[in-house]
Amino acid sequence: MTADSFREASGALTRRQLVIGGGAAALAGVPVLANAQSKTIKIGYLTTLSGVRANFGEADPWSLERVRAALKDGLTIGGTNYKVEIVVRDTQSDANRGATMSSELLLREKVDLLLVQDSDAALAAGQLCDVNGVPMVSTMGPWQAITFGRGSTPQKGFPFSFHFFWGADDVLKNFFGMWEPLKVERTLGTLYIDNGPGHAFADPANGIPNGAKQRGYKETNGGFFKIATDDFSNQVSSFKAARANIVSGFAYANHFATFWKQAQQAGYRPEAVTMAAAFLFPSAVESLGAAGNGMSTEIWWTPSFPFKSSLTGQSAKALAADWESSTGKQWTQPIGYGHALFEVGIAALKNASNPKDKKAVRDALANLQLDSIVGRIDFKGSPIKSVAVTPMVAGQWRKTKAGAKFPYELVITHNSTATQIPVEDELKLLSQLKSA
């Protein structure tokens, strides 16, 4: 993937924001207050509690309640006990607001560590943290969108900002691997949101187009669409004309729901639909009604993952069960990564020679090797500087039997990039599931 395509798609900052030094008043604090502050670690948490990506942050209030409970007695590091304060800001799913909230957490709240759940906000937040010398960890976006989106390279990385997640290349290996056994003509229709991750999947050199070409697929590229788009008639028409048996690309749930409705109205019925981002949540599949049966997706995390939390000791299955019993709602994939973000942050603080020394925390992150609820997070041994690549697989949503707790379940159908995660069944054609 080229750095230029990611920079253009992500709208990465071109001007650096610098810390403005405080006046004499900042130096005249009361000694007792200064001592209390020095024994409090302040963690900033930037997330999406509202807006178009609010479903990614839906579980955060619940998760934060449990993280705070785990940290109620503080952290004892080097013989000193530190209270831990978590300051939360909502990006409202807007990159510009994300930049503003990042600045507020760094300059007004003066956090010791910034954790960023919103990968779109991570672009501006990472640049601000690097300029101001504040350690940052982000997640929930392909690493290429962060590394290349900010004009860096796998060899260069960043001075203070880190990211853990899988890469777009891992998704493609799973998508194409999952389709390999299908007994259909290799015709593929693709469409992509015009944003950083969308450009990652559409990249001519390393994205879906190149993967399709290498494997003998005939691709009909529906191109990029703006996030506010609600008309996909051109894509539907071109896919139907090309008799595309498989539909793929990158789209959010609301986009796909509109596309699928228009496809059904036009009589277009592909045999497989594997759309990155669109089917991460059970609600997205449920919104399609019976048509949701058989939709396939990348999988970052499920209760089936054989990992446990370094923070609470819970297994993936136990964490998901905790959420379902507490809320009555089905588990979602971001639950695992939101939890892991705090696992990484807390581990770095514990491993730092001084958790109030930002360079020491940065160094601890650079050397981190942690077994977490989402799997191994290894910054130290990673060939991509400032990035830890985490395991991911692919799977298919299946309608459950009558009387089941939830209408759909996510079944793992391919694991070529993470064989430690067991496959549960093979991918089935939509026509097979419809006739079953």
Which role fits each region the language model picked out?
Residues M1-L13, A26:
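N-terminal secretory signal peptides
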Residues G44-V67, R89-A95, D118, L191-A202, ...:
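Extracytoplasmic "Venus flytrap"
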Residues V111-G223, A272-T297:
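Extracytoplasmic ligand/sensor domains, especially the bilobed periplasmic-binding protein
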Residues N293, A366-A436:
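Solvent-exposed, acidic/polar segments of extracytosolic/periplasmic ligand-binding ectodomains
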Residues K350-D363:
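Short, charged, surface-exposed loops that flank catalytic or proteolytic processing sites
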Residues G11, V32-L49:
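C-terminal segment of N-terminal export signals and the immediately downstream linker at the start
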Residues A263-H339, N351-A352, P407-E409, T413-S435:
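Extracellular/periplasmic periplasmic-binding protein-like sensory domains
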Residues N55-W62, G74-G151, F225-F232, A253, ...:
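Beta-alpha junction/loop-to-helix N-cap segments that form part of ligand/metal-binding clefts
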